[in-house]
Curated annotation (Swiss-Prot):
Gene that specifies this protein: fba
Originating species: Mycobacterium leprae (strain TN)
Lineage start: Bacteria, Bacillati, Actinomycetota, Actinomycetes, Mycobacteriales
Annotated GO MF terms: fructose-bisphosphate aldolase activity; zinc ion binding
Keyword Zinc attributed: yes
Name recorded for this polypeptide: Fructose-bisphosphate aldolase
Residues the entry annotates as binding Zn(2+) 1: H96, H212, H252
Gene Ontology, cellular component aspect: cytosol
Length: 345
């Protein structure tokens, strides 16, 4: 299918929240990782989200360019082309963008989509993330208000983070402390600033102990109940009935999470879960195995000529792609979106 239109993306998220499942959002940095993600979604019979971080986009533009917007646009256009060959929907998103990179990443990408929409086309991306977790929440939400207006005009969903995700991702670091837990006051401020969709659709990355990177279970205390409290506070603020879920939540830093924690988060309105560390490992593991197994072929040892069949990048990148595809399929099963593609109904 072509990349998910704004209407299809909204329908994907609506069904996910209504039926307590979520979509894996897979960080990609290359054509190989994009191919792996899309095939994983298709093998699961699931729709999915592909996203590019600032660092991933810059990497994709190559050492001679090193420009985030160029890389993001190139990856997006590649994804548009490949996704059209598969029978599922893929939404395009950009990951964490802090304040100092807004003018060199998200805002230029919003402008590109605005120009497309003005000519009757769909936006290049379906959603963008603004990460204001490093600044005071009032400033964070003020910037979010401005971005939400521009995003809505371009038929784009905005993702906003309140609280701090611990660990580090692409240079965006968060300390592991009490700020890992979003407060009821933060949820109220978000509703006051951004509303409940009337000013434009947004996703909320509220924090409940999440940490980027790899950690052993038990080192960080995940508290999905914070999401339940956030929905309760927001519903009361909006005079909605008990049990309503005004927020569409995003689960960041989920590597190493227990299945039970994921399932609990889904019940409280998580519709998108970022997956990066686990798919990075899945991609790299067979490459390292290939190198160790074929070391005397990938290297020209003692004057020998090596073995072209094993140092041809395709020989190990195919293995990497297949392994990452399996991990994406696993994520779809964990998040209960397998077999639920909007395209199939």
């Amino acid at each position: 299918m072509p990349i998910a239109t704004p209407e299809i993306y909204a329908e994907m998220l609506r069904r996910a929240k209504e039926n307590s499942y979520a979509f894996p959002a897979i960080n990609c940095t290359s054509s190989e990782t994009v191919n792996a993600a899309i095939k994983g979604f298709a093998d699961a019979g699931s729709d999915g989200i592909i996203q590019f971080s600032t660092g991933g986009a810059e990497f994709a533009s190559g050492l001679g360019v090193k420009d985030m917007v160029t890389g993001a646009v190139a990856l997006a256009k590649f994804t548009h082309t490949i996704a059209a060959k598969y029978p599922i929907n893929v939404a395009l998103h950009t990951d964490h963008c802090p304040k100092d990179k807004l003018d060199s990443y998200v805002r230029p990408l919003l402008a590109i989509s605005a120009r497309r929409v003005a000519t009757g086309k769909d936006p290049l991306f379906g959603s963008h993330m603004w990460d204001g977790s490093a600044i005071p929440i009032d400033e964070n939400l003020a910037i979010a208000q401005d971005l939400l207006k521009d995003a809505a005009a371009a038929k784009i969903i905005l993702e906003v983070e309140i609280g701090v995700v611990g660990g580090e991702e692409d240079g965006v670091a968060g300390e592991i402390n009490e700020k890992l837990y979003t407060t009821p006051k933060d949820f109220v401020k978000t509703i006051d600033a951004l509303g409940a969709g009337e000013h434009g659709k947004y996703l909320l990355a509220a924090t409940f102990g999440n940490v980027h990177g790899v950690y052993k279970p038990g080192n960080v205390k995940l508290r999905p109940d914070i999401l339940a409290e956030g929905q309760k506070v927001a519903a009361a603020k909006l005079s909605q009935s008990e049990g309503s879920k005004p927020f569409d939540f995003v689960f960041h830093g989920g590597s190493g999470s227990e299945k039970s924690e994921i399932e609990e988060a889904l019940r409280y309105g998580v519709v998108k879960m970022n997956v990066d560390t686990d798919t990075q490992y899945a991609f790299t593991r067979p490459v390292s195995g290939h190198m160790f197994t074929n070391y005397d072929g990938v290297l020209k040892v003692d004057g020998d000529v090596g073995n072209k069949k094993v140092y041809d990048p395709r020989s190990y990148l195919k293995k990497a792609e297949a392994s990452m595809t399996e991990r994406v399929l696993e994520a779809c099963n964990d998040l209960r979106c397998a077999g639920k593609s909007v395209a199939a109904s």
